[in-house]
Amino acid sequence: MAAPCVEAAGPGGFGAWLAARLEALGLDRAVYGAYIAGLLREEESEEERLEALRGVLAACLEEDLLNDVCREVVEKWSESQIVDAKEKKEDEVQAIASMMEKQARITVKPKEISQEEKQRKAALLAQYANVTDEEDGDDEQDSSTATAVNIGSEKSLFRNTNVEDVLNARKLERELLRDEFQKKKEQDKLQREKDKLAKQERKEKEKKRTQKGERKR
């Protein structure tokens, strides 16, 4: 399964910024970006986010660059959260205003009761006049209570099912991202070792050529 686009993983403009920053560092923005965005959402404090980021990027960046990059990412993410919360609040206010405006335009026409309906109701009231108010109240209360319990149970079950589905989906997404990130991390580590070995071999060859030149002189 392909990793979700990092632009979608971060709130506001943070996703696009993170993608560009990772690309400038020579890291896969799709894999690292989605994983980093998930970590930032999960951790609760700035220190926890910094610690988590160090664990992700320690194998990819030099020590002198690591702390600066991690702090830069956390600061950008925090700024985007403030902007995102403000925009969300404005959207909620606008939605409430629109709803109130629509309700104000709705006119409810009172139902006209015919003379025949009035007579029928009067007859029914007279027929059941022997039923006490207390019994009516008890029956009505029992019925209302039962209905409320049923409706409440159905809503609660529906709500719990929805929450469980969302949590399971998020857990699966995190696991998939974690697996893909670990694979990419291992690939990057092997590549760095190969590059380091090749660099060392070039140094050795250059050293031998220099020594040969000195002997010839």
From Swiss-Prot:
- Which PANTHER family does this one have? COILED-COIL DOMAIN-CONTAINING PROTEIN 43
The GO cellular component terms are:
cytosol
InterPro entries for this protein: CCDC43
Please list the residue ranges that the record marks as compositionally biased, kind Basic and acidic residues: 180-204
From the UniProt entry, list the residue stretches annotated as the region Disordered: 180-217
UniProt keyword annotation of Coiled coil present: yes
Report the sequence similarity comment from the record: Belongs to the CCDC43 family.
What is the native source organism of this protein?
Gallus gallus
Q: Where is the composition biased (Basic residues)?
A: 205-217
Protein's name according to its UniProt entry: Coiled-coil domain-containing protein 43
Which stretches are annotated as coiled coil? Answer: 34-135, 168-212
Q: Does the keyword Coiled coil apply?
A: yes
- Keyword line: Coiled coil
- Source organism, top-level taxon: Eukaryota
